[in-house]
Amino acid sequence: SLTRAGLMAGNIMLFGRCWGVMGNYVALYGKQQLGIVDGTGIFFALLSSGLFISRLYGVKGLREGKLAENALEGAVISTVGYTLFALAPGIWAFYASALLIGLGNGRMYPAFLNMFISVARHDQRGTANSSILTSWDVGMGLGILLGGVLSQYLGYSAAFWFTAASQATGTLLILLF
């Protein structure tokens, strides 16, 4: 039954929080803290390139049924990306982290989608699909809200460390699958 997917939903909410913070505040951070006026679009181009590339090389593990392994590998790569972003506030880390986060999320999300669907009965697959999307959306909304509060009162660094910690927590929780 889908009640077994509760831990996975919690993980997806953690990962969605990261995406909510990064996706909404990275351009402001780049402009205000790093002085990148016209280059924040490159961040998103590298992020989407990472997503695309990881979908190409991560599909083999999915076909072999290595869902948790694929999710863990992607989560670790994303954790490195978010941590690099928080740890090294510079232009090179800004762009390198985008590629790493894209590579990780592109590998992690399809694995989670397959795990959600695999715990559902045949007649619950639509519910499983909507459950992962709802979990992601709730996480993103919380990330946008919490990231805004942290950025305003404690600065961007606190928001991005919160993101790295959320990603690391979700990564460790995968070990429970």
Question: Each predicted region: which residue ranges?
Answer:
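Structural signature of the two symmetry-related core transmembrane helices
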Residues: 69-84
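Juxtamembrane cytosolic amphipathic helices that cap and anchor the N-termini
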Residues: 1-15
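Helix-loop junctions at membrane interfaces in 12-TM secondary transporters
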Residues: 86-97
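Short amphipathic helix-loop junctions that connect adjacent transmembrane helices
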Residues: 24-39
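A membrane-interface helix-boundary motif in multi-pass transporters
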Residues: 149-167
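Helix-to-loop junctions at the C-terminal end of transmembrane segments
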Residues: 54-67, 151
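Loop-to-transmembrane helix entry/capping segments in MFS-fold secondary transporters
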Residues: 37-38, 122-132
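Intracellular juxtamembrane helix-capping segments at the cytosolic ends
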Residues: 107-121
